[in-house]
């Protein structure tokens, strides 16, 4: 079957035939490649049957979808539809306290965006996407993005025009600073706002969405557990926030070894029942050498994509100083952008990383170059089966 960039040039009838050919494979929930192909072909089919001018004009109005969804989240509309659907506009107005006319207009757009189902005039029911939108972790992401990412993106035309149309590399002179009129870095700005930090942490705990978690596909036994020194830390989660990864690891591999999560004091929070199994260490990964020496694995989950190359090099060099050659492994859990045929999520995440802190999503070659500069060598690059999913770059000290 033809996939990738070639598929967008096929005639609609050919694309429909390819979708039909996928039907037997889609019955197998474990055939992730079939799902990826189905999504790619479906998007290509949509682009072929829509009028080009309509697509171009709709794009100009597309920001209203996310912004209206943010209002719907503030009014708790998705949760109300899940709880009471099918539910009419009058009931939603009474339950939310908003004007009924506003409810009708917002929900009309949510329906056309397939976030809810319009089952009758001024009446909506929940779909599986509605249920996702009603989750607090996802609502937190929408709140955070509308306060930080959206203003930064809106400022992009002026910012790039004034800065010679080049990628930002100074974390104090980027799009967030330009848009929000602050001299703080994006992360300092977030930390200084408690409600924003809470939303950020909640959202990051759900950053994988429905994509497979790395513990489900990475060979933990052979790559981490086998040959591990019980006298040394097993995993150090660098910049690990509230410990999401290590909590999941402990649940799947209880008592496997010493687990350490590191982050800034303002980010670390009590781990409750897991505090007996996971150590917390205050550490700024930009400040210098890694404090936990000779661990089996140093995990960086969505760290590199937040930073320009020069900052990543500082982080990697600090970790490399603590690694034991031939034993310690560095695991970079990141989106790995293909040289051709990137999916929507990969491209969107790349631009988001750039506008937030001058970061980027990287290709295999970019990871090779970056790690080599830090005195590290790529052992293997593990790619997720999910569409737009993360991979893991496994590296060791040269």
Curated annotation (Swiss-Prot):
Single annotated GO MF: O-methyltransferase activity
Transmembrane keyword on record: no
Enzyme Commission (EC) number: 2.1.1.-
InterPro entries: COMT-like (IPR016461), O_MeTrfase_dom (IPR001077), SAM-dependent_MTases_sf (IPR029063), WH-like_DNA-bd_sf (IPR036388), WH_DNA-bd_sf (IPR036390)
Binding site residues for S-adenosyl-L-methionine: 263
GO-annotated biological processes: methylation; secondary metabolite biosynthetic process
Pathways per UniProt: Secondary metabolite biosynthesis; Alkaloid biosynthesis; Mycotoxin biosynthesis
Keywords: Methyltransferase, S-adenosyl-L-methionine, Transferase
Keyword flag Transmembrane helix: no
List of catalytic residues: 305
Organism domain of life: Eukaryota
Pfam families referenced in this protein's UniProt entry, alphabetically: Methyltransf_2
Protein task: O-methyltransferase; part of the gene cluster that mediates the biosynthesis of penigequinolones, potent insecticidal alkaloids that contain a highly modified 10-carbon prenyl group. The first stage is catalyzed by the nonribosomal peptide synthetase penN that condenses anthranilic acid and O-methyl-L-tyrosine to produce 4'-methoxycyclopeptin. 4'-methoxycyclopeptin is then converted to 4'-methoxydehydrocyclopeptin by the ketoglutarate-dependent dioxygenase penM through dehydrogenation to form a double bond between C-alpha and C-beta of the O-methyltyrosine side chain.
Assigned protein family: Belongs to the class I-like SAM-binding methyltransferase superfamily. Cation-independent O-methyltransferase family.
Annotated protein name in UniProt: O-methyltransferase penC
Annotated source species: Penicillium thymicola
Gene that encodes it: penC
